[in-house]
Amino acid sequence: MTNQSTMDKLIEMRLTAMADAFRSQLNDPKFKEIPFEDQFGMLVDIEYSSRKNNRLKRLIRNAGFDQPEANIMDINYASGRKLNKELIRRLATCEYISEHRNLFITGATGCGKTYMACAFGMEACKQYYNTKYIRLPDLLIDLEVARTDGNYKKVMAKYANPVVLILDEWLLLKPTESEQRDIFELLHRRRKKSSTIFCSQYEFEEWYDQLGGDDSPLADAIIDRIAHDSYRINITSIDAEHDISMREVYGLDKTLRE
C-alpha cells in the first residue's frame, strides 16, 4: 500500500486532519527517528483535536447567540453595577447545567443581561452542551407559524431539546392565552432535564403578574415549572444617576439589545 493510497483512504473516511498530519510527517525527516507508536499517537491527537474544535464551532454557530463575542472573562465588575463575582464564577463552571437548574438574570435595559447570558451560553458550548439563544417574542412567533403550517411538534422540539436554552426579553410583553399555553408546554418539557436562562427587565416577583396573575390559570403552573432551585442574578446600579450603558462598556452598537 502506498502512502498516497493511505492518505486517500483517510480523506475518504473524513479523517482530513489526520491525512494532512500524515503528509507533514512524511515530508519531515525528523519523524523518521520517532517510533511508530508515537507518530501514530500524534496523528490521532491531531484528528481528535480537529474534531473537537469543529464540534465547538458548530455548537456556537447553531446556538445563534445575539452576542457571540461575549466572554465570561470580560464581564465588567467595575462599571457601577452590583454583581456577585463568586456566583458568576461558580455558574461559569456549568455545574448548574448538570443539576438541571435554571438561571434568572434580571435588570434594567442596558445593564448587560444579554451579554452575560451569552457569556454563560459560550461556556456551555465549550463544555459541549447543545445550546440555543432566542428572544421570547421570536419563539412565540415561530410556534404560532408552526401551528398554522402543521410543524408545531417539530418547532417545539427545536426549543425543548437543547440542554441550555437562553430566553431573552422574557415577559417583556404580556403573553396572550395561547402564548401562555405555548410557554407552559415548552417549560414543562424542559423541566428537570435541562437548564433555561431567563433574561428579563422584570424582577422575578413581577413575573406572576406579567403572566396574567390571578386571571390566568397557567400563571402559577408556569412559575412552578421554573422557580424551584433556580439561581438568580439581579443586576442593579450602585448610582443610577450616573449609569453607563453596558453596550458602551462592551463596545457594542447602541442599537443592539443589551
Question: How should these model regions be labeled?
Answer:
Residues 70-94:
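N-terminal pre-Walker A segment at the start of P-loop NTPase domains
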Residues 100-116:
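Walker A/P-loop nucleotide-binding motif
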Residues 75, 117, 135:
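Conserved hydrophobic/aromatic pocket- or pore-lining residues that grip, position, or stack substrates
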Residues 121-134:
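Post-Walker A helix-loop "phosphate-sensing" segment adjacent to the P-loop in P-loop NTPases
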Residues 101, 128-130, 161-164, 192-198:
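Loop/turn-to-beta-strand initiation segments
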Residues 11, 16-67:
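Interdomain "pre-motor" coupling segment immediately N-terminal to P-loop NTPase/helicase cores
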